[in-house]
Amino acid sequence: FDGRNAAANDKASDLVALTVRGCCSHPACSVNHPELCG
């Protein structure tokens, strides 16, 4: 188990979560990605 990879994966998923929240607050983006915004 490589702790550095785990940390990198956590950072990547944090970035995705931030991007998803930003997308879902923009109607045009949330319409294009309904699977992200529910």
Curated annotation (Swiss-Prot):
Expressed by the venom duct. Changing V31L: 5-fold increase in ability to inhibit alpha-3-beta-2 nAChR and 1.1-fold decrease in ability to inhibit alpha-6/alpha-3-beta-2-beta-3 nAChR. Changing S30R: 4.6-fold and 7.5-fold increase in ability to inhibit alpha-3-beta-2 and alpha-6/alpha-3-beta-2-beta-3 nAChR, respectively. Changing A28V: 4.5-fold decrease in ability to inhibit alpha-3-beta-2 nAChR and 2.5-fold increase in ability to inhibit alpha-6/alpha-3-beta-2-beta-3 nAChR. Changing S30A: 3.3-fold and 2.4-fold increase in ability to inhibit alpha-3-beta-2 and alpha-6/alpha-3-beta-2-beta-3 nAChR, respectively. The hydroxylation at position Pro-27 is critical, since an hydroxylation at this position decreases potency of the toxin to inhibit both alpha-3-beta-2 (1300-fold) and alpha-6/alpha-3-beta-2-beta-3 (130-fold) nAChRs. Changing P34S: 1.5-fold decrease in ability to inhibit alpha-3-beta-2 and no change in inhibition of alpha-6/alpha-3-beta-2-beta-3 nAChR, respectively. The record marks H26, P27, V31, N32 as: Important residue for inhibiting alpha-3-beta-2 nAChR. The modification Cysteine amide is found at C37. Disulfide bonds join C23-C29, C24-C37. Coiled coil: none annotated. Changing S30N: In PeIA-5667; 33- and 270-fold increase in ability to inhibit rat and human alpha-6-beta-4 nAChRs, respectively (IC(50)=0.20-0.48 nM). GO terms for molecular function: acetylcholine receptor inhibitor activity; calcium channel regulator activity; toxin activity. Changing S25A: 1.9-fold decrease in ability to inhibit alpha-3-beta-2 nAChR and 1.4-fold increase in ability to inhibit alpha-6/alpha-3-beta-2-beta-3 nAChR. Changing S30H: 14-fold, 11-fold and 10-fold increase in ability to inhibit alpha-3-beta-2, alpha-6/alpha-3-beta-2-beta-3 and alpha-6/alpha-3-beta-4 nAChR, respectively. It is found in: Secreted. GO terms for cellular component: extracellular region; host cell postsynaptic membrane. Keywords: Acetylcholine receptor inhibiting toxin, Amidation, Calcium channel impairing toxin, Disulfide bond, Ion channel impairing toxin, Neurotoxin, Postsynaptic neurotoxin, Secreted, Toxin. The keyword Disulfide bond applies. Changing L36I: In PeIA-5667; 33- and 270-fold increase in ability to inhibit rat and human alpha-6-beta-4 nAChRs, respectively (IC(50)=0.20-0.48 nM). Belongs to the conotoxin A superfamily. Alpha-conotoxins act on postsynaptic membranes, they bind to the nicotinic acetylcholine receptors (nAChR) and thus inhibit them. This synthetic peptide potently and reversibly blocks alpha-9-alpha-10/CHRNA9-CHRNA10 nAChR (IC(50)=6.9-54.9 nM), alpha-3-beta-2/CHRNA3-CHRNB2 (IC(50)=9.7-97.5 nM) and alpha-6/alpha-3-beta-2-beta-3 (CHRNA6/CHRNA3-CHRNB2-CHRNB3) (IC(50)=11.1-17.2 nM). It also inhibits alpha-6/alpha-3-beta-4 (CHRNA6/CHRNA3-CHRNB4) nAChR with a higher potency on human (IC(50)=6.75 nM) than on rat receptors (IC(50)=130-147 nM). This is Alpha-conotoxin PeIA. It comes from Conus pergrandis (Grand cone). The lineage of its organism: Eukaryota, Metazoa, Spiralia, Lophotrochozoa, Mollusca.
